[in-house]
């Protein structure tokens, strides 16, 4: 739904790169809103590598969307973006920049009587007074919330409480656990999630198969479409909600589903259907961003839970599954940690838990 123009006669203007937006920014915008009728928030920058936000993986478009999301339910705040690509560097860039700001004000307001900029740098006061004398400029004190976007980018976990929820998805550390069936993936994910007080996304296929009472070897093309899309959606939802402390665990992803597709359907469906599933897998996998991937070797006993296909229980098939999984994951080999390599059957589960914690500490610098 399109936002209406800001109709107030007193408009506050707050601009910044917001890479990321933190609660100090929100505090400033809220103060500006309460001192005026409305506030126009301008997310500035570019989608080029000259922009520090873009260099940190937060493009101008992403920042714009996320800041809008922060104020989705505030009718007194409108968010727009200013693309600085092609503008000269400051100080020469002030003239085109101010002209573009004037365009955004005209676009988003209804002939306000008073415009007030809220800035944090004395230089901005001087330049805005020079190039936009019709507006007032107020130099604001730093928020009592002592944090900066630079500090957050340098150490997001330490400063997690300051990051606004939409931006948290960018900084979330995501740990994936994969492997063949009956290897202890789900148990390990649950144990790690409890230990680190983090949410987890469990294997969606199990919920799906129980709901529709369908076994592994009975899943068809339509089922796998659901498994690919819904597993991704379930995990993304946990990440996007931001109701965590910067760490989430996931049991299974699209790559595991792809191995099952290749095992069960490659020779049993039309090439057209197989290509459809492969394209869907490629799109889904490209959207997944993992910081650490645990691959569990098939050293535990294969358990018949009523849904598993017991023709996959032999060591040869389980080894093939693991090799194919590792082959598909090879583009991300720098993220992979193999669990169970040097374990025997007695120490397998204990070793996996210990080595997973060790890798999380060494790779992600996260301790209990």
For the regions a protein language model found, what residue spans apply to each?
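The conserved Walker
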Residues: 181
